[in-house]
Amino acid sequence: MAFRGVDYFCVDSLLSEEELMVRQTARRFAEERVLPLIRDCYRDARFPSELIPEMGELGFLGANLHGYGCAGMSNVEYGLVMQELERADSGVRSFVSVQGALVMYPIHAFGSGEQKSRWLPRLQSGRAVGCFGLTEPDFGSNPAGMRSTARRDGDAWVLNGEKTWITNGGMADVAMVWARAEEGILGFLVERGTPGYSVSDIHGKWSMRASVTSSLSFADCRVSESARLPGAKGLKAPLSCLSQARYGIGWGAVGAAMDCYETARQYSIARKQFEGRPIASHQLVQEKLAWMITEITKAQLLALHAGRLKDQGKLEPAQVSMLKRNNVAMALDCARLSRDLLGANGITDEYPVMRHLCNLEPALPAPKGFECFFTP
């Protein structure tokens, strides 16, 4: 049965025709292209890279950026795309988030004209894939403590250090790498195949299995001055990228929660126990479903208001953190309740609930720590 949406408070009435059309496009892509293959991808720990060109054609990559072939969507439209992609699987949403918010955004915001012209059209179309190298083995929630270094050597820079838990790392044509120099924290575009730059994929994950996660290593990796983003100086630059990513996660979590709720609702209607009655006829089950839809509705309204503020240029980083913190925690609770309602069936991959539950676990701290969002 095709997904019709979860809207118990007429939230759709707050969306424009253009926003509804964008959501329908993303919803159709999720239904027709992602869902038929995502269970096998999750089983096989494989990212469906065959979908990348189509996501580029649909304008999903760098969707809310302008120029260089980007779709120029509003931030609400971009959020709706994130919602629908995560409803299918977080691995697909994460790919799009990293490509747009963590690679294309810093190039767009801090890059030179030559860097923008060279990379943005290729990244937008999916002809090139990027990754974001910030997290280190000893510094995850505290990026200010990074040990990766950039040392000027004539007209070049020499990079040394390690990055880990890097989405898209093993498939990336270019890495957006952050390192400490005498001038402060700087950003560099390091291409695949650069001497001294190596990548190893992280295996054995219980979560985000339909996503590539890697470690990056830099050993006297020499890049030219043209690889440095001239407008990126200090920790504020990478932190601004994280705010872009958190915004997308906040919307995506709503999609995962919707899928868990709808799965539990349909299951509880079809599942009959105790004299042949649907388990949905019991008040205990009804209370759980009512709690889920109430929390989803609040999360929808929070995401929509955040999107409106962002489109007006008024959304603050702390507000983005609140959006992401609230909505991911809500989605995790919905996934756990849904798994409970499905009983033993909840742990099988015949249903998407356990996949969402596993995927949402690292989304709670990522990027950069659940407990750190509101600390001074």
Where are these predicted regions, by residue range?
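A short, charged helix-loop
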Residues: 214-240
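Short glycine/proline-enriched turns and hinge-like loops at secondary-structure junctions
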Residues: 73, 142-144, 168-172, 210-211, ...
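A short core secondary-structure module
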Residues: 156, 160-200
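N-terminal glycine-rich flavin-associated loop
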Residues: 94-114, 140
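Short Gly/Pro-enriched turn/cap motifs at secondary-structure boundaries
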Residues: 138-141, 165-168, 180, 205-212
